[in-house]
Amino acid sequence: MKRFLNCFMLIIFITAFCEAKVNQWDKMKEVYENIPLPTFPDKTYLITDYYNGTDSLYTSAINKAISVCSAQGGGVVVIPDGVYKTAPIRMKSNVNLHLSDKTLLMFTTDYNLFDTVLTRIEGIDCYNISPLIYAYGETNMAITGNGVMDGMASEANWFSKERIDGVTLKNGKKVAEKTVLYDLKEDSVPFEKRVFKGKTGMRPQFINLYKCKNVLLEGFTLNRSPFWLIHPLLSENITVRKVKMQSHGYNNDGCDPESCKNILIEDCDFDTGDDCIAIKSGRDEDGRYWNIPSENIIVRNCRMKDGHAGVAMGSEITGGCYNVWVENCLMDSPNLSRIIRIKSNAIRGGEVKNVYVRNITVGQCDESILGMEMKYWHVDDGPYPPYFHNIYLENIKSNKSRYLL
């Protein structure tokens, strides 16, 4: 049945709506104006100048061009038109990695070519095989251009890995790598001893920015990711603009800022196998160890074609989530379960507050405009009950959904 849902002044645990609404949208403008974009010297480095002419992969050429560019004060590393295959790329400060219009960058699925790096997998700190593009502690960076990057993930490689490889326990039982990671977290094993590499490595993210600042991701297309597509982690001042995300594998979230501050996601296209955007801040004891929220997140002018939720907060939200603005987005898919979804449980905990949503057009979604779950994953009890408050929705129009809330 066709339903028209005009949710002007839908208030969840809110008082003084009109006054707060005006002030908070003004605050969004302040946050936006204080997210700096990176700048680069007018110097160009072609990856083909660093290619030896014999390697089957361009990994060495790309990473050497990036290292030289950064060491010489920065500039633009250009991947010219053409098809290139590579292992993981390591980004560095003051480098703009630019994909030309007709560039196709394909990533190998041979995990033996992947280094081991510090990251988080589903909110749990560990060392894992490297994301396809990784940066740690870098500043003033960009990945730009209209080219395509293909993670090559399929059932023939990454998505069957957990079933085929896994980890063999002392009793001979084989379990998935993430099951071992969950157990290490529950046993409070230190981060540096949670190491997954080579055959025991878990599916990596496409782009992982760990403790980075002042980063621009703009223009390119991401296809077939092994895991989450864009994962800023413990980072600040990140702009994701005009990026097309097309990936329908398991856990293929589009953009997941985790324990981040000042994030702008605008004019992007999401066609993903999981949440289009999922804001996170760590999980359980790891999240409480860091206790760093995600805050000041702006999502605007985006198109969500497919995915589980349009914009989610959680479920790994232990560190909290504050000040989220979502506006002027189009969401339309029978596979979108909820337009806005907030999820946690009494083990993960976390406070979510000050979420402002307006001017959203929904062609259809499967379940509801807003979903809030405090017993996510069927967890009824625990010592850390989550707290969701100050959630505002205004001018949400849906042609088809089973429920409002």
Roles of regions detected by a PLM:
Residues G74, T86-P88, T108-T109, I129-S130, ...:
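Short glycine/acidic-rich loop motifs that flank beta-strands on beta-rich extracellular proteins
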Residues V83, L234, S281-R283, S315-I317, ...:
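Active-site-proximal loop/turn and secondary-structure-junction residues that shape catalytic pockets
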Residues I317, L336-L405:
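Extracellular beta-rich repeat passengers
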Residues G53-S56, N252, D256, C260, ...:
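Alpha-helix capping and helix-loop boundary segments enriched in small/acidic/polar residues
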Residues D101-K102, T139-G147, K213-N223, E236-S247, ...:
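Right-handed parallel beta-helix
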Residues K2-N6, L10, A16-V78, V83-N96, ...:
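Extracellular "leader-to-stem" segments immediately downstream of a signal peptide or signal-anchor
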